[in-house]
Amino acid sequence: MQPSPKVYVEVNVYFTKEGQMRPRSLIWEDGITYGIDRVKAIRPAHAERAGGLGDRYTIIVNGRERYLFFEHNTDFGNQTVGRWFLERREQ
């Protein structure tokens, strides 16, 4: 059985005074923490390989560009705002 192409991760974020959510680091499924060097862009987008829709953050981690997605929760009765995920790299 192949692992899911969508990898949910824990993300350390801060909010600007304008209300923008900015990720600072993420914890990969193996427990390793990666600092986010820079956020290049934020835009609504879908994850092509993993599926899902949300905000796509184009980030730089260790000099490499990656897409980090924030998937909004549409269940307004739930206290969870949403979840972060990355698309697993193809083997």
How does the language model describe each region?
Residues M1-Q91:
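Cysteine-centric segments in proteins
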